[in-house]
């Protein structure tokens, strides 16, 4: 959520920023919220004037009674004042709800360093690590490798649940579990994050706090009859751990790493990368979440991105980092990096992590603040998160980049201690 004061003071600037994002944004929302804000402030002034008049008349009643004079006229006037105040209170509540409705639908303001552009083709490559894997034999896609090795069962996943669900079997399941533990160990032991195991269902307030609702409700799995949502990422429960709280500045930055299953309807992605493990309705992920002081947030974003990169370096998987352009930035981020791993079957890099600084956008929605040294006026915190990284896509990348001509797959050395020193899947 943006600062309403900034919109009030610079409505035309905000309109231009929204148009430059490349999204289909209705600038009338800005005009409407400015008008509602003006009406809100008018109501507050009028209510204060009415209350002042009522207090003045209330003090006169005592004097009139002492003097034995008639108070009926002034009592009637006070009743009218009270009725008018109640009417304004009702209108104020209505105006506040309308303001909230609009504010929840206005996207974040991009950082000045976000490049111009409309699609992912306009994203800017920042750096690469490793070289794309080359083979001297005809390589296979991970869905064929997994099926041939009998470690991934797409057919039975479809029978059990439907398209874009997968059953991991035998060494496939063990590989997934090994990756989860490797990622968590690196982030907690080497990078200093505190591990969190969060609920996989959250309420509407939590989904609203991190920005999934109301805009992306069609992409969420909702549990009917009780208002719960299956989490699309551990970002949601971990960020909302601190909803409506005031943190101590001495405790910042707070760094959490959370493994969870993730659930996404992906309503707008029909036909996109739907084979294999790249785009599933249910998948596992280790998420990194930070709560930091505003002046530290962009340094912390660089550190978070490096932390996510480290797990790919440890696995020897070639990747690149791109800075996301305005049109591809999404609703909540002020600046975002994507980490893309090399996938031979696609002959291109594929997103495996997004690392974002939301500045105070989520904190305003979730009302997360801090006090410097635990004292003074509370200020909104900055929140950051990033995938550290997606597990299923890591499995896919390992199967494709570490495949051998005989159909086996070499297990990356870093994972072998988690797989009882097994070195090959065959």
Swiss-Prot record:
GO terms for molecular function: ATP binding; catalytic activity, acting on a protein; serine-tRNA ligase activity; transferase activity. Gene3D superfamilies: Bira Bifunctional Protein, Domain 2, Serine-tRNA synthetase, tRNA binding domain. CDD domains: SerRS_core (cd00770). Its EC number is 6.1.1.11. Catalyzes the attachment of serine to tRNA(Ser). Is also able to aminoacylate tRNA(Sec) with serine, to form the misacylated tRNA L-seryl-tRNA(Sec), which will be further converted into selenocysteinyl-tRNA(Sec). Belongs to the class-II aminoacyl-tRNA synthetase family. Type-1 seryl-tRNA synthetase subfamily. This is Serine--tRNA ligase. It comes from Clostridium novyi (strain NT).
């Amino acid at each position: 959520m943006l600062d309403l004061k900034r919109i009030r003071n610079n409505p035309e600037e905000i309109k231009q920023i929204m148009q430059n994002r490349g999204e289909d944004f209705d600038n009338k929302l800005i005009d409407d919220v400015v008008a509602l804000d003006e009406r809100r402030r008018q109501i507050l002034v009028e209510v204060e004037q009415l209350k002042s008049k009522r207090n003045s008349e209330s003090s006169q009643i005592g004097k009139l009674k002492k003097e034995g004079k008639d108070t009926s006229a002034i009592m009637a006037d006070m009743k009218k004042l009270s009725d008018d105040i109640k009417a304004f209170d009702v209108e104020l509540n209505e105006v506040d709800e309308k303001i909230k409705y609009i504010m929840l639908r206005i996207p974040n303001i991009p950082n000045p360093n976000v490049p111009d552009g409309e699609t992912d083709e306009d994203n800017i490559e920042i750096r690469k690590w490793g070289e794309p894997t080359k083979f001297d034999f005809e390589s296979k896609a991970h869905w064929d490798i997994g099926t041939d090795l009998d470690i991934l069962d797409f057919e039975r996943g479809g029978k059990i649940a439907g398209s874009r669900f997968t059953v991991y079997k035998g060494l496939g399941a063990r590989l997934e579990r090994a990756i989860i533990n490797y990622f968590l160990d690196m982030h907690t032991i080497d990078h200093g994050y505190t591990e969190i195991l969060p609920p996989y269902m959250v309420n509407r307030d939590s989904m609203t706090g991190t920005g999934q609702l109301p805009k992306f409700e069609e992409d969420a799995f909702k549990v009917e009859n009780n208002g719960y949502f299956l989490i699309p990422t551990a970002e949601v429960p971990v960020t909302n751990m601190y909803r409506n709280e005031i943190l101590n500045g001495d405790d910042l930055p707070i760094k959490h790493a959370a493994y969870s299953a993730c659930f996404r309807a992906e309503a707008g992605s029909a036909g996109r990368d739907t084979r294999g493990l790249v785009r599933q309705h249910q998948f596992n992920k280790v998420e990194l979440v930070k709560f930091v002081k505003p002046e530290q947030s962009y340094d912390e974003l660089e550190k978070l991105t490096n932390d996510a990169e480290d797990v790919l370096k440890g696995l020897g998987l070639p990747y690149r980092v791109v800075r996301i352009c305005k049109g591809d930035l999404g609703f909540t981020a002020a600046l975002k990096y994507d980490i893309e791993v090399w996938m031979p079957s696609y002959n291109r890099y594929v997103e495996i992590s997004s690392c974002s600084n939301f500045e105070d956008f989520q904190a305003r929605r979730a009302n997360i603040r801090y006090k410097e040294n635990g004292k003074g006026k509370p200020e909104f915190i900055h929140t950051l998160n990033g995938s550290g990284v997606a597990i299923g896509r890591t499995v896919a990348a390992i199967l494709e980049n570490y495949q051998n001509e005989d159909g086996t797959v070499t297990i990356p050395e870093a994972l072998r201690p988690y797989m009882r020193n097994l070195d090959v899947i065959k």
